[in-house]
Amino acid sequence: VWLYNEAISHFGGQTEAFFASLARPDRAPEPGVLPGRALRVASIDIGGGTTDMAITHYQLDDGSGNNVKITPQLLFREGFKVAGDDTLLDVIQRYVLPALQTQLQKSGIADASQLMASLFGDSGRIDTQAVLRQQTALQLFMPIGHAILAAWESSDVDDPLAGLHATFGDLLTQKPTRNVMNYLQQAIDHALPAGSEHFDLFSVPLHVSFREMRDAMLAGQFTLAAPLHAVCEAISHYSCDILLITGRPGCLPGVQALIRHLQPVPVNRIVWLDKYQVHEWYPFSQQGRIGNPKSTAAVGAMLCSLALDLRLPRFNFKAADIGAYSTVRYLGVLDNTINTLRDENVWYHDIDLDKPGAKLDARLHFPLRGNVTLGFRQLANARWPATPLYTLSINSAELAKAIAGDGVLNVRLKLRGGTKQEGPESFELSDAWLQDGTPVPPDALTFKLNTLADRRHSGSHYWIDSGSVYLK
């Protein structure tokens, strides 16, 4: 979308002039490439569930004027399962829950943290309150969190005193259902001392400083900060000409401040697509600008489809050359709470799932002493964030007792699927045995996908599905 709009609307179809004006003079051109005939564009898409980054090299051929073709080459891509939903959870845990807990303590409840844990924590089991806990998150905490983020997004970044001062009731456009209110009120009334005043949930005060939120983002106290640090480091390494930022969380002042602070490219080369001016050709434009950030994906796909049929006048783009690749290069055991894959925990190196007929080294096997989460990273750098992929758990009581003693479980993985023309589809458990050579039956182990990035809770459910938002 950005490439087409710049070339056609701002440069009148003169793609050569467009490339020459934006190419960085401080980056040496590739061998055999004339200066000003290539652009290196990075994009960061911060969505609700994932943060995705791609660095693409755009090269002009030997044509001139309107008769020139753009050939893209994907240099690097990465994606992390940390994005807007995690920022919402951070806001709930940093501001909403402490405000409620403080008000409970002021009302006379001595052990407010225990009450909060029983109402909103992770019980580790499916109990009768599971549905009510989830509905509380959906009807109470998430709307308040969204209201805080919306106020932050529209705030004056130059006002050091900007903030949100309201009550829970002020921020709720729709009150929770009677069942949810009864669930909360009964538990609170039971914990209140005898003779206490009625606790009004909608009167809980909430005070949020937007400057403090920005400082927390810059200090890395938001979950989203870690993947942004990683992708900005990669973008800086590639000396990109332009950085495009899209996605609703990218509109937050704290996210914008962090990216400007990291400065993967000079600030004047960062394009925020939420404020990007488009012309009448853009089908979803709102007052000359991109309204819905999600629309850029649909319009970009439309442009690629039209380019394949040569139906874009004055814009020749070789869309067929854009292809993704697997980012699974190093697979191993993740740390318990943070998504880090240390070098000593890497099981398999230099995996290539795009290679037809790829196989894992059958000689390799690995010792286990309990349930583990397997994850992967793309780079040979232990600092690079890893992504959870599988959980390997023991579901046999006899096997668990053997391992709890002096036993060590050895496991071996293999790749499933794939042909001479296509790469493999997934990993699976090949075989397992104890250190004395006793084979372990397949039904004693469970090897399943688990791509949840947030492992701060002991449960295996996503926080929006479980409603478990309180951390002890």
Task: List each model region and its residues.
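Extended, charge-rich low-complexity interaction segments
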Residues: 17-35, 39-40, 45-48, 106-119, ...
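A short acidic Gly-Thr/Ser loop motif
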Residues: 35-52, 56-59, 84-85, 247-250
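Conserved helicase motor "Helicase C" RecA-like lobe of SF1/SF2 P-loop NTPases
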Residues: 251-271
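Nucleotide/phosphate-binding catalytic cleft detector across ATP-hydrolyzing
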Residues: 1-41, 449-472
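Long C-terminal appendages of very large multidomain proteins
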Residues: 345-472
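Phosphate/ATP-binding catalytic cores across multiple sugar-kinase/actin-like superfamilies
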Residues: 3-34, 187-239, 255-258
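Glycine-rich phosphate-binding/hydrolytic loop that grips phosphoryl groups
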Residues: 1-13, 85, 89-90, 271-329
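Phosphate-binding glycine-rich/basic clefts of nucleotide- and phosphate-handling proteins
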Residues: 55-197, 310-392
